[in-house]
């Protein structure tokens, strides 16, 4: 039987959990059940939320709010048809309850019908006295629809309602960034900081906008203010370090990265950036020390392995570079950047068969960058496969139809094959695309640049371009 409880009314969760451990049944107000259920839902304890809903409806079978929480759980668990049937019944009981429209919107959102979800949320707005949560949901629906302008406006309303709603603040800035309106973001954040001068989150975001615009002194000031507002804000120290790197102040950058390590468990990203700073300072042993720590901390961080490989590659220690890129490939053989670097190293070692294989792997895994096509063609040429080199360049041309580099290189290889007709077409196309890059052709194919055949083509195209 239900018992009265001497528990304080502000302790319904403790009281409920105590009840679950015994055979007693305590009575709760419907509002208490709502608080208990919200607590469990917010903490991801769905099973306990469902228990609270079941007991709550046994004690308050007419409570629309408890039934709506049951619908919320059904939607979360993707029992959408059952949830819709419940909502149909509830709407006959209370047709002006905005939560009914919100849950219907959630169902449509789950079905990827975001336009219908928006329409229902706008209906809920007309019924609600407190529209804060609805604007947040609208913002998310607009994000799903890639309508970043309307999403930004919705999240701005949330921030205007509660300036401590940092989740919405982040979303506002995300929308500005996606719209590439960095000036708009800077203006918005400065306006926000006029009202909240000690908000470390806003200072941090402002610094990132300045960094994007390469306004490094302003970015540095913003991150300093973020640290003044919260001297344990790790993100501000890390971003400040990146700014100091850009300004060439590598020792100061190291101090900021080390601060993040001292405040929290070390991260591979911090080790990596410290290593790069030491390399810039020509502290080679320290650079290696931190690069090795980077891959020890996170063996799957591709930037770490590439940093060690590049370290040796820049010093022309190609065998060591090859050793480390092969270790990286053993960890992640599906990484196109690893294969591209492997190709560069094998080319430097004049192992052109291996380089050809590595370039092919990189392309097959989705690396379609222009230098990859050009490098692969050069390797094919070194392997005496001129026809293969031309074929590679024609593939690359599909991705870069306006690339003069591809055209000049194609013309040179076609001349090597004595394919004069296609060589003429390729060279004319290259000159029309970028006459100024004729030097690329001259440097790679000096044996042809001074021939009458090439001079005549160059002269004719030059005259046509002047007209």
List each model region and its residues.
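Canonical positions in the second alpha-helix
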Residues: 56, 89-90, 123-124, 157-158, ...
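Canonical tetratricopeptide repeat
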Residues: 69, 103, 137, 171, ...
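Structural marker of alpha-solenoid helical repeat scaffolds
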Residues: 59, 92-94, 127-128, 161, ...
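TPR/TPR-like (Sel1-like) alpha-helical repeat modules
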Residues: 364, 412-439, 462-465
């Amino acid at each position: 039987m239900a018992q009265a409880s001497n528990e304080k009314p502000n302790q319904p969760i403790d009281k409920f959990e105590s009840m679950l451990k015994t055979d007693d049944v305590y009575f709760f107000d419907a509002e208490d059940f709502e608080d208990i259920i919200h607590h469990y839902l917010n903490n991801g304890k769905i099973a306990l939320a469902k228990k609270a809903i079941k007991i709550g409806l046994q004690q308050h079978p007419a409570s629309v709010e408890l039934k709506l929480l049951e619908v919320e759980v059904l939607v979360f668990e993707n029992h959408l048809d059952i949830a819709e049937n419940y909502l149909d019944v509830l709407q006959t009981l209370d047709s002006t309850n905005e939560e009914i429209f919100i849950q219907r919107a959630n169902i449509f959102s789950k079905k990827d019908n975001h336009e219908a979800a928006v329409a229902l949320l706008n209906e809920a707005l007309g019924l609600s006295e407190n529209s804060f949560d609805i604007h947040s949901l609208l913002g998310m629906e607009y994000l799903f629809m890639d309508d970043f302008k309307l999403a930004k406006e919705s999240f701005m309303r949330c921030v205007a309602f509660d300036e401590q709603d940092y989740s919405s603040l982040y979303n506002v800035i995300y929308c500005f960034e996606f719209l590439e309106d960095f000036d708009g973001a800077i203006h918005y954040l400065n306006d926000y900081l006029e009202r909240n001068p000690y908000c470390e989150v806003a200072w941090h975001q402002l610094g990132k906008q300045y960094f994007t615009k390469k306004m490094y002194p302003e970015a540095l000031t913003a991150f300093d203010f973020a640290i003044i507002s919260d001297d344990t804000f790790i993100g501000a120290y890390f971003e400040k370090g990146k700014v100091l790197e850009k300004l060439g102040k590598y020792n100061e950058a190291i101090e900021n990265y080390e601060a993040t390590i001292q405040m929290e468990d070390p991260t591979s990203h911090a080790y990596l950036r410290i290593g790069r700073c030491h390399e810039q300072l020509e502290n080679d042993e320290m650079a290696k020390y931190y690069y090795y720590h980077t891959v020890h901390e996170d063996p799957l961080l591709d930037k770490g392995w590439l940093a060690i490989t590049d370290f040796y590659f820049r010093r022309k220690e190609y065998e060591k570079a090859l050793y480390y890129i092969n270790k990286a490939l053993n960890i992640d053989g599906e990484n196109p950047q690893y294969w591209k670097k492997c190709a560069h190293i094998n080319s430097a070692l004049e192992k052109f068969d291996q380089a050809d294989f590595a370039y092919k792997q990189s392309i097959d895994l989705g690396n379609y960058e222009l230098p990859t096509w050009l490098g692969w063609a050069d390797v094919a040429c070194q392997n005496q496969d001129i026809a293969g080199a031309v074929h590679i360049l024609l593939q690359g041309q599909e991705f870069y139809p306006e690339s003069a580099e591809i055209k000049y290189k194609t013309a040179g290889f076609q001349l090597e094959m004595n394919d004069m007709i296609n060589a003429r077409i390729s060279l004319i196309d290259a000159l029309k695309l970028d006459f100024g890059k004729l030097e690329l052709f001259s440097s790679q194919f000096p044996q042809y640049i001074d021939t009458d055949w090439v001079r005549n083509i160059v002269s004719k195209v030059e005259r046509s371009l002047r007209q």
